Amino acid sequence: MKRGNAKKVMALSIAVCMAVTTAVTALPTMQLRAQEPGQTAQGTVTETYSNERLDNGYTKVSAGYTFAAYTGEPILYRMGDVPQSAVYYMNFDYLANSESILPVEAGIMVNGEYPFYEMRQQKLESQWTSNPDQWTLAPRKVYDSYGNEVVSMPDKIYDWQNKYIQDSTYRYTQPLGIELQQGRNTITIELNEGTLLLGNLTLTAKPQVPEYTGSEAAAGDGFIEIQAEDFLYRNDSGIHAACEFDPDLYPYQAAKRVMNTVDAASFGQGGQEITYLMEVEKAGNYYIAFHYSQGDKADFPVFMNVKIDGRIPNTAFENHAFAYEKKYEMYTMVDGDGSKISIPLEAGKHTISMQISMEPVRESLETIEKIMSRVNDLSLEVTKVAGTNKDKYRDFSFEAYIPGIGEMMTGWADELGQVMEDARVYNPKKNKIAAYASVKIAENQLRSLAKKPDELIYRIDELATSTSSVNQHLANLIDSLNGNDFALDSIYLYQEDAAKQLPKNKNIFTKMWLGIVRFFTSFGEQAYSSTNTNPEHLQVSVNRSRQHLEIMQLLINEQFTPQTGIEVDLSLMPDQTKLVLANASGDSPDVATGVNYSIPFELGIRGALKDLTEFPDFAEVAERYNAGLIMPYVIGDRIYALPETMNFQVMFYRKDILDKLGLEVPDTLEEVQAMLPDLQMRGLNFYYPTARTVGMKTFLDTTPILFQSGGTLYDGAIDKAILTSEAWLLRHGQEACHTDQVLPGCDLLRPERV
C-alpha cells in the first residue's frame, strides 16, 4: 500500500471522505491586540506574527461554542443526518497496518475546514510488544554472547483500536469536542503519515471520569510485584528498558548487565503510555506503589494518568503528580489529604497503564506561548518605527509611537509571575520552583525594560533575538515542561498486611560494598572489546554507542548468521584514529563501520584496505548510492569504502514572517538577495551555512552554490581543478570581466580561447 493511501472497511457506511492530498492551507495573518481586554495598556501593534495555535486553538474555539453539550446515547454516525445541533465527542475504530515505526498521522476536517488547530494533526498510535505470546506473564529475555541482557526488538501489534479525537501533544487528558449542526455534516480525513483501515465512527457525549470520593481500606495480605522492564505493550516503539548499576534496583548484578528499569530518556513525551499485565489471586482492594525516579524537572512533578484495564478509575488517578526524585524512591499513591488510594480488583488478569499527561501545565504553556507571540510582535513593531540603528546615544520616545508600551511589558511580567505562582501549587514548600527559573529571569527582564522603554533602541535584542532574550528564556521553559523523563523500576499492588514486603533502598554500607565488588569485576572480561573476540569469526569494529552495537549484534545473530553461516564478532571502537596504528601492528579488524569519511583515504594510500570493486556484487550494491557520495573513497581506479550515512542541508523558513511581510518562499539565491532588504530593515536575516566559517569557506558549504549554478570542480581529470567555468559567466555576465582583472570565468573571453 502506498504511503498516504487508506482502505475503508466494508462495514463503513459513514459520510467520510478519505483524501490523500498534501496541500498546505495558508495561515491567516491577524492583527492582534498587544494585551487582553481589561489590562491597563491601550497600545496595539500592527506588525504581528501569525500563530494558529493561539488564534484558532481548542481552548479559544471551545470557549466560543454556542451549542449545548450532547448528553444522549452514543450515535453510530452513518450517512444521514445528525439528530440535533450539539457539541459531540467523536471516536473511531482503526487498525494501523503500515510497517513504519512512526504513528499514523491524520488531519480531520468538518464540513471542509478544520474546526480548531489541534484537528490538523491527530496521532493514531500503534501498540508494540516484546513478548512472542502477548498475554503471558513470562516476558522474553534476550542475551548477547557475553551473557549480558540486551534490549529486545519490539514487534508491532496489528489489532483494532479505538480512539477519541485528542490533542496530539496531550495537553488535554479528555477528548476534544466539536460542534455539529443538525442535519448533514461531512467528515474529511487526510492521512499525512502511514496507512490504516478505518472502522466505525461514533458520536458520543463527553466521556466522564468518576469523581473520587475516598477509598476503602485495603484489608488482606495480597501482594503483586511488576517489574517495569517487562512491558506487556507500549504505544511508542522507542520506549525501552535499560540497565543501571544501582543496587536499589531489581534485578541487579555487579558483573553482568541486566535490564532493570524503564529508560527515562525514552519515556518522557506527553501521551506516551506503557502497559503491564498482572494476575490478581485474591479479589479485594489494593494500594498501588511505584519505585521510580524523575530528576528532569527540579522541584516540580511529572503527571501521569494511571489506568486499570484501559480506563482511569476515578479522578484521583487522573493527572496524578509524581514528585521530583533524583534517586529511586518508593511512593504509594495518596489523595490530596495524604490518605492512601485503593482500587478494587476482581481475581484474574488485569492491566495497569501509565500515560504521561500534560494537562496540569497546559494553561502555563498557553500563557507562555501567548506572551512569546506578543513579544515577537513588539520586537517587529520596535524595529519598524526605530529601524535597526542600535546607537546607545540616540534619543527616541517609543511612547509616542506605541502608547502604553511600558504598561504592556509590565502586564506580561505580571502574567509570568502568575505562572510561577501556579507552579507552586504542586510544591508549596518551595518559594521558587527551580524548573521555572527561566520564567523568573524573563519576568525580571521585562520589568527592567518596562521601567525604561526608550532603552529598547539599543536593548531590542533582549526581547526576542539574542540567546539571553525574554523569548529564549521562555522557549527554554517550554522545552523543560515538555520533557518528563521518568524512570520506573517496579510497580507493587499490596494490601495492608503485606506493606512490610515493599522493598527498601539499600543502606550506605551495602552500597559501598557492592560498589567495591562492581569495581573489581570491571577488570574481568571486557564485553565487545577487540581483545575479546574469536579469530575464526569475522571481526567488525563499530564506532557507535554500545546500545547501537548491541542491536547490531542481535540482528546479526538472529538473521545474518543463520542465513549465511558466517559468525560475526562486533567490538567497540575506542578511537577511530587508532585504525592506522592498528594496521601497522597487525591488529586491525576485518571491517570498520561508523568512521569519519576521511579515514578510508588515510588507510587506502597505505594499502590497508581491500579494493571493493573486486567483489562480484559491487556494481549492484554501488547503484544504491549517489555517485558523488563515493568520491571521497576513490583512489585511482579503486574504491575502498561505501557510505553508511548521508548528511544533507535543508532550508526551513518562518511562514508567519513571510506571510506578514508579503514575501514568497525563495527558490533561488537571487530571490533571497531580493528579499534581504525587507528582512534586514526589521532586524531579520537569511542564514546560509557559509556564515559559520569566518575565514576559509569549505567545500561542504560552497559546492552546493557551485553545482546549482552549473559549475564543476574538475575538468576531466582529478588533478586539474577548473573553478573558472562558463557557469561563472552565466551567473555574473560578461560585463563583470575587465582586461585588467583576473576573475573566474573571464579567461573564457580571451582570444586564445575563442
What role is predicted for each listed range?
Residues 2-13:
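Bacterial N-terminal signal peptides that target proteins for export
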Residues 570-571, 613-616, 634-700, 705-751:
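Helix-loop-helix "hinge/cap" segment bordering the ligand-binding cleft or interdomain interface
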